[in-house]
Amino acid sequence: MSNKKNKNQKNNKLNIIKIIIGSLCIILLVMTIILVSKPELLYRVQGSFLGRNDNHISFKENKYSEINLQGFDLNSQTEWRSEQSLILLNKAHALPEGFVPQMAEYKDSGVQMNVAILDAYAQLSAAVTENTGDKMYVSSVYRSVEEQAELQANDPELALPPGNSEHHTGLAVDVYVFEHAGMNFLESEAGQYVNKNCYDFGFIIRYPKDKEDITGISFEPWHLRYVGLPHSKIIQQKFITFEEYINLLQPNKFYHYDKYLITRQPLNSNIKLPTGLQNIVYSPDNTGHVIVTGQIID
């Protein structure tokens, strides 16, 4: 009687184990189907769990007393590099009056890009080919106000109004690989590489997943925006949008990330910086401020 009872208990345990294993297999199968059918979710899983934050670098505010700050006239700093890389354009921030993009031709291709992104895009494109074997192509970079007006007239729900598109700056790049454009870009190895690693080259996914309430644009894994280093890596590390990053940089405060010092100050003011900086770059942000970035001398 006791042996029969023990045997029944053993069978019950085996049945429970089989049910648990079967349930786990079903869950795994469902998750696999979902990830395969929705590559943007696969991108998010990869971005969260496959090494994007393995080398976490702190981003923190640095406080300086006035006695340790030196004033600079922005217009007379010939050794500083002026860029347009951090200009914010969206539905609420239109192209500044009198804005002229700093454009140049990319590698005798006939494609016009903002000069700030030429080297970075070349490096990203080469890395895509080296790591995936695919060649990355550009479908759109610079777009005039007139071209944007025509585009919006044809598709008013998707296209931003003329004057509000990042393509006016030459800093936004729509990319694709053979047989994989638009949302299908993420189905390619190249698309997944770009969405995971573009931040290392100064680019961001300008309209990330689940941030439409902030950007006003649904997820576009093919739309890259150049903001430069270290800004792209901070944005990636914090999983925030460009809008959120601009708001993160409080005016007249100083932030330290790796070997960089970053400050956002009123555009028409005497820029105050601590000593011991080199390779200083500044860019207006289209909110009445300028973002200054410098490398800290060891």
Language-model regions, residue ranges each:
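Extracytoplasmic cell-surface/polysaccharide-interacting catalytic and binding patches
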Residues: 2-5, 10-141, 145-298
